Amino acid sequence: MSDIKKAVLAYSGGLDTSVILKWLQDTYGCEIVTFTADLGQGEELEPARAKALQFGIKPENIFIDDLREEFVRDFVFPMFRANTIYEGEYLLGTSIARPLIAKRQIEIARLTGADAVSHGATGKGNDQVRFELGYYALEPGIKVIAPWREWDLLSREKLMAYAEKHGIPVEMKHKQGGSPYSMDANLLHISYEGRHLENPNAEAEESMWRWTVSPEKAPDAPEIIEIEFRAGDPVAIDGKAYKPHELLAELNRIGGKHGIGRLDLVENRFVGMKSRGCYETPGGTILLKAHRGIESITLDREVAHLKDDLMPRYASLIYNGLWWAPERLALQTLIDHTQQAVNGVVRLKLYKGSVSVISRDSANTLFDQNIATFDDDGGAYNQADAGGFIKLNALRMRIAETAKRKRAQK
């Protein structure tokens, strides 16, 4: 790919992507465009602009974009309409951010006339797959540079040596060994990987967690909140309307102080290995519980069961980087159709790491108290009808048992 003229780099301004920027300049000799996404990671992003300028990047080739609203509105909320969980635990905070970054990189490539894109994902992880499947889905002819699959800088020490050799500033934390974890954050979650977490038998240190208090140290009194949903998406907390990204940030704040959303798991990566990660997803944990609560009274039984059947497949598509694939888009159409009547208010109790639904109400409720009551229903439900229903559903099992007995007599 030596004929590359211009490349758009997903650039955080940190050590890894700063080394990549210099390496791209030296290895490919091409013009570089940097793109830094604000997904609510809580970091000051303007230093990335200053660092890019130090590398000689033209001011017009430096993009720092606030994507928080688009991220939550067009990616997080659609995913939560499906009650998406990967392997029974993971709420996909990293996975769902990658398709948006890839989308914006391709948009910038078109805007600037770039013929290539580049990312800082390693050759061992899922992110390389997520980024590149997105690139190719949105721009089939794009060229992709994945430095971690090309260079020999395969350790933190080699990265630092390269940085010092080329005058790339190395923060003191890296010189002293840095944070013991590889972290990734956005409005949905913060993740921790690496170092002693690579031993699945080692307990995560309490000092690692950044967004949530220890459940043991959370308030001794529970907090009750209300979340209003409209067409499957949350729109208000305690009667106050929020924009999507503001609502998720507020749920993170509320959940964090009650120790909600901590997770320590071993997951199966798409590339084949098992990986241990720790996550904090306070707002997402509350949102998932609330959404299932409002669906419990607004969704038809078979529709709800169908959604539950399809959800693991939908989750795997997102985890594996197939957000832009036709099968994910088809599933999204179905999921969104099911959400038309998912409107109403859910009340939840937050207490020392737990979140519980305590009430739910909707103008579209399918819960009929007159039928469900244990008291006299005035003939709304004829209990005698249940006998025939049971016999018909037992018919196939009765036939099977009768046939088994006949075989045993031969």
Swiss-Prot record:
Pfam families referenced in this protein's UniProt entry, alphabetically: Arginosuc_syn_C, Arginosuc_synth
Q: Which CDD domains match?
A: ASS (cd01999)
Its principal location? cytoplasm
Q: Give the UniProt keywords, A-Z.
A: Amino-acid biosynthesis, Arginine biosynthesis, ATP-binding, Cytoplasm, Ligase, Nucleotide-binding
Per the record, the pathway is:
Amino-acid biosynthesis; L-arginine biosynthesis; L-arginine from L-ornithine and carbamoyl phosphate: step 2/3
Please tell me where ATP binds in this chain: 10-18, 37, 120
A GO biological process this protein is involved in? Answer: L-arginine biosynthetic process
State the compartments where it is located.
Cytoplasm
Name of the protein this chain belongs to: Argininosuccinate synthase
The protein's organism comes out as: Polynucleobacter asymbioticus (strain DSM 18221 / CIP 109841 / QLW-P1DMWA-1)
